[in-house]
Amino acid sequence: MASTNFDLEDQKYLEDVNAVKQWWTDSRWRYTKRPFTAEQIVAKRGTLKIEYPSNTQAKKLWKILEERFNDKTVSYTYGCLEPTMLTQMIKYLDTIYVSGWQSSSTASSTDEPSPDLADYPMNTVPNKVNQLFMAQLFHDRKQREERITTPREKRSSVQNYDYLRPIIADADTGHGGLTAVMKLTKLFVERGAAGIHIEDQAPGTKKCGHMAGKVLVPISEHINRLVAIRAQADIMGTDLLAIARTDSEAATLITSTIDYRDHAYLLGSTNPSLQPLNDLMVAAEQSGKSGEQLQAIEDSWIAQAGIKKFDDAVIDTINQGSFANKKELINRYLTAAKGKSNSEARAIAKGITGMDIYWNWDAPRTRGGFYRYQGGTQCAVNRAVAYAPFADLIWMESKLPDYKQAKEFADGVHAVWPEQKLAYNLSPSFNWKAAMSKEEQLTYIKRLGKLGYCWQFITLAGLHSTALISDQFASAYAKQGMRAYGELIQEPEMERKVDIVTHQKWSGANLIDHSLAMVTGGISSTAAMGKGVTEDQFKS
């Protein structure tokens, strides 16, 4: 075993600890809560310091969003499918999004397509980030080489794009427990992501934000995920952005009642004469019933159970009783019970009504053991307020592009955390034509920006735009042959001066030729862009 100078070892450790403490004093972290210490972080680092490009990209992203939030403007983007799309997006948009939905359907690391259930291997989205980030680096090198080898008097005619737009990627629910979240975060940092978002659904039952049947985890469990992301990023020395998504606006189930902050939104049965639903269903199955018969039994039980939130059960008890000043009693109860656990709310209700109100959250539990839950905008606000100290941005998944709802959410969050940056999904799952007029569509992003939604994105625009042009071209090509290619693809490319019209140059053939010439002393008989290359036809 190698001998160790313990004094030097401890000195280096303390120097690193002090460096982390100094890092955390940066204004970047002025709203960030860390329930761990710099000593704990440094102790989990190796002795070889690695500088990750992700850190540069994260700092760049933070600067963009800080400026947007302060100016009440917006950085908006959409889900990128592959490098061709990336190189066109960077001309006009300042961030790039990588969608788990798109990756699930088109880029699983098993090559098995799937809907957005996050049942693909956890390296799927990081691999897509890596593909795009490597393309960014390559096209940036290609552009620099072309510019620096062009005389200054002609250089203004050479493109000068920022290929290194920060990438924000979908981490779904983290693909497992907290160690999985940390490993997934590590993958994203290693692959070049500037930020990731993680949602508060349960991993085994995760659904697309616009599917039914979503099951939440308790608030505390999702906070642990956010802390795990920050801890892993800190271990790696990066400013990676963590975006907290809540699916609570439309959720109907939750895994546990352990967190008192969830209690106000849990549902319970108010009919004491009914046996628990699961007991009834097990007995029905054992008697030979199945399928539609079981569904009918469950529907009948639900209809009789009087399922509601505890607050509503208290309000109904007061309204149905012989109390004087019912409105005053209701307001008194709601004020006193706000933010309290169910046991505390029960005691408050008994003190006001003089009775124990029957309300049982175990009775309606599902066969999977989940508790029933009533989401909504205020439910999402409740969760967002809890997540805010641990998240750089917060996103509420919603059913519709509803400005009034978006304002209610933003106002609710900013009443507690006025500095909180927000994100918004401009989802293709919405019927935009039915939702608003063309004039409203034109201003929707800007109007949301005024509310603090400084980062907005169309998750699947890459998928849909690819499908549309593919359908248009395939249909025309089948009928018109090469005329379709000329009219629908090549001529519009040339008119718009899309760089990929000269696809050999776009792919970096010149860069590779020059690299070969460099290592062969300037002579190469196999240059890809030499005499005979067909792209000479496109020179004006």
UniProtKB/Swiss-Prot annotation:
PROSITE patterns cross-referenced by the UniProt entry: ISOCITRATE_LYASE (PS00161)
Chain residues that bind substrate: 99-101, 209-210, 245, 425-429, 459
Keywords for the protein's UniProt record, in alphabetical order: Glyoxylate bypass, Glyoxysome, Lyase, Magnesium, Metal-binding, Peroxisome, Tricarboxylic acid cycle
GO MF terms held by the record: isocitrate lyase activity; metal ion binding; methylisocitrate lyase activity
Pathway: Carbohydrate metabolism; glyoxylate cycle; (S)-malate from isocitrate: step 1/2
Active site: 208 (proton acceptor)
InterPro entries named in the record: Isocitrate_lyase (IPR006254), Isocitrate_lyase_ph_CS (IPR018523), Pyrv/PenolPyrv_kinase-like_dom (IPR015813), Pyrv_kinase-like_dom_sf (IPR040442)
Enzyme type, top EC level: lyase
Residues that, per the record, bind Mg(2+): 170
Entry GO CC: glyoxysome
Keyword Kinase in annotation: no
Alphabetical list of Gene3D superfamilies matching this protein: 1.10.10.850, Phosphoenolpyruvate-binding domains
Record field: catalytic activity: D-threo-isocitrate = glyoxylate + succinate; (2S,3R)-3-hydroxybutane-1,2,3-tricarboxylate = pyruvate + succinate
E.C. no: 4.1.3.1, 4.1.3.30
PANTHER family in alphabetical order: BIFUNCTIONAL GLYOXYLATE CYCLE PROTEIN, ISOCITRATE LYASE/MALATE SYNTHASE
Record family assignment: Belongs to the isocitrate lyase/PEP mutase superfamily. Isocitrate lyase family.
The protein's name: Isocitrate lyase
